[in-house]
Amino acid sequence: MSPKTETKASVGFKAGVKDYRLTYYTPEYQTKDTDILAAFRVTPQPGVPPEEAGAAVAAESSTGTWTTVWTDGLTSLDRYKGRCYDIEPVPGEESQFIAYVAYPLDLFEEGSVTNLFTSIVGNVFGFKALRALRLEDLRIPPSYSKTFQGPPHGIQVERDKLNKYGRPLLGCTIKPKLGLSAKNYGRAVYECLRGGLDFTKDDENVNSQPFMRWRDRFVFCAEALNKAQAETGEIKGHYLNATAGTCEEMMKRAIFARELGVPIVMHDYLTGGFTANTSLAHYCRDNGLLLHIHRAMHAVIDRQRNHGMHFRVLAKALRMSGGDHIHAGTVVGKLEGERDVTLGFVDLLRDDFIEKDRSRGIYFTQDWVSMPGVLPVASGGIHVWHMPALTEIFGDDSVLQFGGGTLGHPWGNAPGAVANRVAVEACVQARNEGRDLAREGNEVIREAAKWSPELAAACEVWKEIKFEFETIDYL
C-alpha cells in the first residue's frame, strides 16, 4: 500500500479537513476476488476534480466523514475503507465520468441486502459536492453471494413443479386492478386459467382494501385455480399478493396461502422492503411456495440516467434477497426498456456466469456460482401481435404476462386467454422449425389466426396499437 494512503495510529491525530483523494483515491490498488466492486456515474459540482469526487463517493459510502476524527487511529482504515481505484470519462458527456470503487467484504453483514444498500446507496447520494450520482452496476463476489439463500426455488424447480417445459409461461394481471369484489375477481381468474393461461396475478396495488379483503380474495382465487386445474389437467397458479403494512401481517397472509394449497404468492419487494422480502423468500423455500416479485416504485429509483440506481443493480439485489419471478420490462410494450440493456439484466437474473459486456451495460463479470436463477416477467401494454418479438427476445425461460391483452378481448376473458395460448404455441413451433420470428413473426400470427377465431378477433382489435416513444435510459 502506498504511504500516501496508509493510515496508522502512530502518525498521530491532526484535526482539520483534508481532501478525500489523499486517502480514498488509490489508482494503484489491485482489486481482490473478495471485494465488492461498484461502478458509479458521477456528476461533480463545478470546480470539483474527478479524483476528489470519486474519492468522496468511496469515503462517504464506507468509512469516511467530512473531517478528520481521532478515532481513525483506533482501527485500520486500510482494511476497511472503500477505494476509488479507477476513473473513466462518459462518452458524449463532458461533466460526467464513471468512478470504480472497491469495498472490502468485511464492511457488510452477511446475507443482508438491507445493510449492503444502506452503505453503498445511502447518504452519499445527497452529498453536496456531487450534482448527481448513479450506481450503474455492482460486482457481487461468490464469497458474499454464498451468504444469501437467493430465490426460493429457481427456474428448473419451478418448471418441475408445474410440469411445463419448452415454452414461455403465460400470465395475466386481473383488471380492473381495483374495485372488483372477491367473487367477481375469482371468476375472472377462473376464466383466464380455464382458457389456457398458466398464471393469473394480483395487481401490485391489491392488498386488503375495503372493496376486497385479502382473505376473501385468497379463498375465491384458490377455488378458481382448483376448478381450472381439474378441467384442464394442467397445474395453474395465481399470484396472491401477500404484501402488507407489517412483516407479521405479510407472513400471516403467506401462511394462509400455503394452507389453501396454492403454488405461488407475491410480494412488492421495493415498497415492502428488502428485509421483509428476504424473510418471505426464506418462508417460501421452507414451505414449497413459489415467489413472484413485482417491482413497483423501481422507476422512481432507476429511470433517470444521471441519478439513482440502474435496474440491473436492483435485479441483482432481488436475486440475492429472493424471488422466483420479477418484472423486467418488455422492450416492445408500454413500459420503459431498451433492448440491449434489458437483455443484459435478464441474463444477470437467469444465468450462472455473465461476462462483462459494456454494450449491454454490464460493467463487471458476475459469477453467481450455484445460486438459482429468476424468471424475467414481460408485462405492460403487450398483446398478441407482440408475441413473436417477446418469444424471440426473452426465450423460453420467461413469463409473458398480458393483462389488458387478455381481458380486453372482444369476446371475453377466456377467449382472450385462448388467443394468447394459441399465439405463443404458434411462435414456439415456428421458432423450432427454424423460422425467423423477428422477420416472419406477423406472418406466423396471421397463419395461426386462420384456424383460431379467438386469435383472429384479438388480432383485429389490437392491430393498430403501438407504444412508440423514445427510451429515456439508454447506453
Swiss-Prot record:
Subunit text: Heterohexadecamer of 8 large chains and 8 small chains; disulfide-linked. The disulfide link is formed within the large subunit homodimers.
Catalytic activity field: 2 (2R)-3-phosphoglycerate + 2 H(+) = D-ribulose 1,5-bisphosphate + CO2 + H2O; D-ribulose 1,5-bisphosphate + O2 = 2-phosphoglycolate + (2R)-3-phosphoglycerate + 2 H(+)
Free-text function comment from the UniProt entry: RuBisCO catalyzes two reactions: the carboxylation of D-ribulose 1,5-bisphosphate, the primary event in carbon dioxide fixation, as well as the oxidative fragmentation of the pentose substrate in the photorespiration process. Both reactions occur simultaneously and in competition at the same active site.
Family per similarity comment: Belongs to the RuBisCO large chain family. Type I subfamily.
Sequence positions bearing N6-carboxylysine: K201
HAMAP family in the record: RuBisCO_L_type1 (MF_01338)
PTM note: The disulfide bond which can form in the large chain dimeric partners within the hexadecamer appears to be associated with oxidative stress and protein turnover.
Propeptide regions on this chain: 1-2
Catalytic machinery residues: K175, H294
Residue(s) carrying N6,N6,N6-trimethyllysine: K14
Organism whose genome encodes this protein: Keteleeria davidiana
Biological classification of the source: Eukaryota, Viridiplantae, Streptophyta, Embryophyta, Tracheophyta
EC number: 4.1.1.39
Site feature: Transition state stabilizer: K334
Pfam families for the chain: RuBisCO_large (PF00016), RuBisCO_large_N (PF02788)
List of residues that carry N-acetylproline: P3
Entry protein name: Ribulose bisphosphate carboxylase large chain
